[in-house]
Amino acid sequence: MGCYSMGFVGRKAGMSRVFLEDGCSIPVTLIEATANRVVQIKTSDVDGYDAVQVTVGSRRSVLVNKPESGHFAKAKVEAGRGLWEFRVEKTQLGSYSVGSEVGLSIFAVGQKVDIQGITKGKGFQGTIKRHNFRMGDATHGNSLSHRAPGSLGQRQTPGRVFPGKKMSGHMGAVRQSVQNLEVVKIDVERCLIAVRGAIPGASGGDVLIRSASKI
């Protein structure tokens, strides 16, 4: 069993840069970090594991189905734009209660964090863009195979395409994590947190922020 810690749900706001005291500028990603509301506390005795379920933001009532509406009503929490869970240690459950809020106080400047998001969708792409294949020669004798993927394998034996073969297909729109990003700045008044470097996804996408699991 690993070591779990509370996380935070934010929204990617975009990228900027921050000047350090020595005059160097570093790229940072700004994350909108409004307070997360606790919807449910899950315990190993009842649910089989210990976790804190949170929501953030708001959603129109017509977009909330009946099961979700009842779930939020039971917790007496305004319906948010989604539900997320963070595994925590059993000893940490006492720090949270249904209806309470989780803020940026769980992070500190200089701390290393892992951030998870959904990458930008690229649609259907060929092997050159999707898997960094080499292009065919752009010269005499090559008329239709400049971006062709090439051979898929052998002939009658084995007579099939092996699973996992790199081919054309849908690219992007997958869950991806970036580890060990440094927290550069925390602005509590503006509900912003700045981390060094880039994070997955487009501006406006939800991201999960956790304490770094590997340092």
From Swiss-Prot:
PROSITE patterns: RIBOSOMAL_L3 (PS00474)
Residues where N5-methylglutamine is found: 156
Processing after translation: Methylated by PrmB.
UniProt GO MF annotations: rRNA binding; structural constituent of ribosome
InterPro entries to which the protein is assigned, alphabetical: Ribosomal_uL3 (IPR000597), Ribosomal_uL3_bac/org-type (IPR019927), Ribosomal_uL3_CS (IPR019926), Transl_B-barrel_sf (IPR009000)
Cellular component GO terms held in the UniProt record: cytosolic large ribosomal subunit
Sorted UniProt keywords: Methylation, Ribonucleoprotein, Ribosomal protein, RNA-binding, rRNA-binding
One BP annotation, GO: translation
Keyword Ribonucleoprotein among UniProt keywords: yes
Subunit and interaction comment: Part of the 50S ribosomal subunit. Forms a cluster with proteins L14 and L19.
Family, as annotated: Belongs to the universal ribosomal protein uL3 family.
Record function comment: One of the primary rRNA binding proteins, it binds directly near the 3'-end of the 23S rRNA, where it nucleates assembly of the 50S subunit.
Name the UniProt record assigns to this protein: Large ribosomal subunit protein uL3
Species in which this protein is naturally found: Xylella fastidiosa (strain 9a5c)
Recorded name of the encoding gene: rplC
